[in-house]
Protein backbone atom coordinates (compact mmCIF):
# COMPACT_ATOMS: atom_id res chain seq x y z
CA UNK A 1 0.00 0.00 0.00
CA UNK A 2 1.62 3.27 -1.12
CA UNK A 3 -0.02 5.29 1.66
CA UNK A 4 1.34 2.95 4.33
CA UNK A 5 4.84 3.18 2.85
CA UNK A 6 4.65 6.97 2.89
CA UNK A 7 3.75 6.88 6.60
CA UNK A 8 6.96 4.97 7.36
CA UNK A 9 9.26 7.44 5.62
CA UNK A 10 10.52 10.78 6.92
CA UNK A 11 12.53 13.47 5.14
CA UNK A 12 15.04 15.37 7.27
CA UNK A 13 16.56 18.33 5.51
CA UNK A 14 18.75 21.12 6.79
CA UNK A 15 17.80 24.68 6.03
CA UNK A 16 20.21 27.40 4.99
CA UNK A 17 23.03 27.67 7.53
CA UNK A 18 22.11 31.20 8.62
CA UNK A 19 18.56 30.09 9.51
CA UNK A 20 19.53 26.93 11.40
CA UNK A 21 20.45 28.68 14.63
CA UNK A 22 17.17 30.63 14.56
CA UNK A 23 14.92 27.58 14.43
CA UNK A 24 16.95 24.60 15.65
CA UNK A 25 16.78 23.71 19.32
CA UNK A 26 19.84 21.49 19.94
CA UNK A 27 19.27 17.91 21.06
CA UNK A 28 21.80 16.36 23.43
CA UNK A 29 22.88 12.81 22.62
CA UNK A 30 22.11 11.82 26.22
CA UNK A 31 18.45 12.77 25.59
CA UNK A 32 18.18 10.07 22.93
CA UNK A 33 17.58 6.43 23.79
CA UNK A 34 21.10 5.31 22.85
CA UNK A 35 22.91 2.28 24.25
CA UNK A 36 25.31 3.29 27.02
CA UNK A 37 28.42 1.92 25.24
CA UNK A 38 27.55 3.97 22.15
CA UNK A 39 26.86 7.08 24.21
CA UNK A 40 30.24 6.60 25.93
CA UNK A 41 31.99 6.43 22.54
CA UNK A 42 30.18 9.57 21.32
CA UNK A 43 31.23 11.39 24.51
CA UNK A 44 34.85 10.22 24.15
CA UNK A 45 34.84 11.54 20.59
CA UNK A 46 33.96 14.94 22.08
CA UNK A 47 30.33 15.27 21.03
CA UNK A 48 27.52 16.34 23.37
CA UNK A 49 24.88 17.79 21.05
CA UNK A 50 23.46 16.59 17.77
CA UNK A 51 24.04 18.66 14.68
CA UNK A 52 20.82 19.95 13.09
CA UNK A 53 20.58 17.05 10.62
CA UNK A 54 21.20 14.55 13.42
CA UNK A 55 18.67 16.22 15.71
CA UNK A 56 16.04 16.06 12.99
CA UNK A 57 16.81 12.57 11.67
CA UNK A 58 17.72 10.51 14.75
CA UNK A 59 14.36 10.68 16.57
CA UNK A 60 12.75 9.13 13.48
CA UNK A 61 15.48 6.69 12.42
CA UNK A 62 15.83 5.42 16.00
CA UNK A 63 12.06 4.77 15.92
CA UNK A 64 12.48 2.57 12.82
CA UNK A 65 11.31 5.07 10.22
CA UNK A 66 13.01 5.31 6.85
CA UNK A 67 14.80 8.65 6.64
CA UNK A 68 16.07 10.69 3.71
CA UNK A 69 18.55 13.35 4.81
CA UNK A 70 20.12 16.22 2.95
CA UNK A 71 22.74 18.56 4.39
CA UNK A 72 26.09 20.10 3.57
CA UNK A 73 29.32 18.10 3.80
CA UNK A 74 30.64 17.83 7.35
CA UNK A 75 27.30 18.24 9.11
CA UNK A 76 27.10 14.77 10.65
CA UNK A 77 24.98 12.75 8.23
CA UNK A 78 27.36 9.79 8.44
CA UNK A 79 27.21 9.74 12.24
CA UNK A 80 23.40 9.93 12.08
CA UNK A 81 23.04 6.74 10.08
CA UNK A 82 25.84 4.94 11.93
CA UNK A 83 24.32 5.79 15.33
CA UNK A 84 21.03 4.39 14.05
CA UNK A 85 22.67 1.17 12.85
CA UNK A 86 24.67 0.66 16.06
CA UNK A 87 21.55 1.24 18.17
CA UNK A 88 19.48 -1.14 16.06
CA UNK A 89 22.07 -3.91 16.36
CA UNK A 90 22.38 -3.37 20.13
CA UNK A 91 18.61 -3.51 20.63
CA UNK A 92 18.09 -6.43 18.23
CA UNK A 93 20.99 -8.84 18.68
CA UNK A 94 20.98 -11.85 16.42
CA UNK A 95 20.20 -15.15 18.12
CA UNK A 96 22.31 -16.90 15.50
CA UNK A 97 25.11 -15.28 13.53
CA UNK A 98 24.57 -15.35 9.76
CA UNK A 99 26.86 -17.04 7.29
CA UNK A 100 30.09 -15.31 6.33
CA UNK A 101 29.61 -12.52 3.80
CA UNK A 102 26.02 -11.89 4.96
CA UNK A 103 25.82 -8.33 6.34
CA UNK A 104 22.98 -6.91 8.42
CA UNK A 105 23.42 -3.46 6.87
CA UNK A 106 24.72 -2.29 3.51
CA UNK A 107 26.12 1.22 3.11
CA UNK A 108 26.72 2.18 -0.53
CA UNK A 109 29.13 5.05 -1.17
CA UNK A 110 30.04 6.44 -4.60
CA UNK A 111 33.79 6.73 -4.00
CA UNK A 112 36.58 4.82 -2.29
CA UNK A 113 37.48 7.88 -0.23
CA UNK A 114 33.96 8.29 1.16
CA UNK A 115 33.63 4.55 1.87
CA UNK A 116 36.92 4.54 3.80
CA UNK A 117 35.82 7.63 5.76
CA UNK A 118 32.55 5.89 6.69
CA UNK A 119 34.49 2.82 7.84
CA UNK A 120 36.75 5.04 9.97
CA UNK A 121 33.75 6.80 11.54
CA UNK A 122 32.20 3.40 12.33
CA UNK A 123 35.42 2.29 14.04
CA UNK A 124 35.34 5.43 16.19
CA UNK A 125 31.80 4.69 17.37
CA UNK A 126 32.65 1.03 17.94
CA UNK A 127 35.00 1.65 20.89
CA UNK A 128 32.77 -0.13 23.43
CA UNK A 129 30.59 -2.27 21.20
CA UNK A 130 31.09 -5.30 19.02
CA UNK A 131 29.80 -4.17 15.62
CA UNK A 132 31.93 -5.53 12.80
CA UNK A 133 32.33 -3.21 9.82
CA UNK A 134 34.01 -4.28 6.59
CA UNK A 135 34.80 -1.97 3.70
CA UNK A 136 35.14 -3.23 0.11
CA UNK A 137 36.18 -0.72 -2.54
CA UNK A 138 37.81 -0.64 -5.94
CA UNK A 139 41.45 0.31 -6.35
CA UNK A 140 42.55 -1.73 -3.34
CA UNK A 141 43.69 -5.34 -2.96
CA UNK A 142 40.71 -7.59 -3.75
CA UNK A 143 42.12 -10.70 -2.04
CA UNK A 144 42.84 -8.79 1.17
CA UNK A 145 39.29 -7.40 1.18
CA UNK A 146 37.90 -10.89 0.52
CA UNK A 147 39.91 -12.31 3.43
CA UNK A 148 38.61 -9.53 5.70
CA UNK A 149 35.05 -10.12 4.53
CA UNK A 150 35.25 -13.87 5.17
CA UNK A 151 37.10 -13.57 8.49
CA UNK A 152 33.85 -13.51 10.47
CA UNK A 153 30.25 -12.31 10.50
CA UNK A 154 29.74 -8.78 9.14
CA UNK A 155 27.30 -6.32 10.69
CA UNK A 156 27.93 -3.34 8.40
CA UNK A 157 29.27 -3.69 4.87
CA UNK A 158 30.48 -0.41 3.37
CA UNK A 159 30.97 -0.73 -0.38
CA UNK A 160 31.35 1.10 -3.62
CA UNK A 161 28.94 -0.19 -6.29
CA UNK A 162 31.57 -1.65 -8.61
CA UNK A 163 33.39 -3.61 -5.91
CA UNK A 164 30.09 -4.80 -4.46
CA UNK A 165 29.19 -6.21 -7.87
CA UNK A 166 32.59 -7.94 -8.04
CA UNK A 167 31.90 -9.70 -4.74
CA UNK A 168 28.29 -10.51 -5.66
CA UNK A 169 29.44 -12.06 -8.95
CA UNK A 170 31.82 -14.32 -7.00
CA UNK A 171 29.06 -15.14 -4.49
CA UNK A 172 31.24 -13.94 -1.61
CA UNK A 173 28.45 -11.61 -0.43
CA UNK A 174 24.84 -12.54 0.25
CA UNK A 175 22.49 -9.57 0.68
CA UNK A 176 19.55 -11.77 1.71
CA UNK A 177 19.76 -10.78 5.40
CA UNK A 178 20.23 -7.02 4.94
CA UNK A 179 17.98 -5.20 7.42
CA UNK A 180 19.12 -1.66 6.62
CA UNK A 181 20.25 0.00 3.41
CA UNK A 182 22.06 3.34 3.37
CA UNK A 183 22.79 5.05 0.08
CA UNK A 184 25.26 7.82 0.85
CA UNK A 185 25.44 10.79 -1.54
CA UNK A 186 22.69 9.38 -3.74
Where is each model-derived feature located?
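Eukaryotic nuclear low-complexity, Arg/Ser/Gly/Pro-rich intrinsically disordered regions
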Residues: 8-10
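SF2 DExD/H RNA helicase N-terminal ATP-binding lobe
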Residues: 2-4, 15-186
Amino acid sequence: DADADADDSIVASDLAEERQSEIYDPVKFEELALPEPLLNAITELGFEECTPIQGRALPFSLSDYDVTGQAQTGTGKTAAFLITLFTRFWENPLQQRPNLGTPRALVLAPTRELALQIEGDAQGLNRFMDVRTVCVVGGMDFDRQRADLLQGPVDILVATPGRLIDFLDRRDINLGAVECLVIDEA
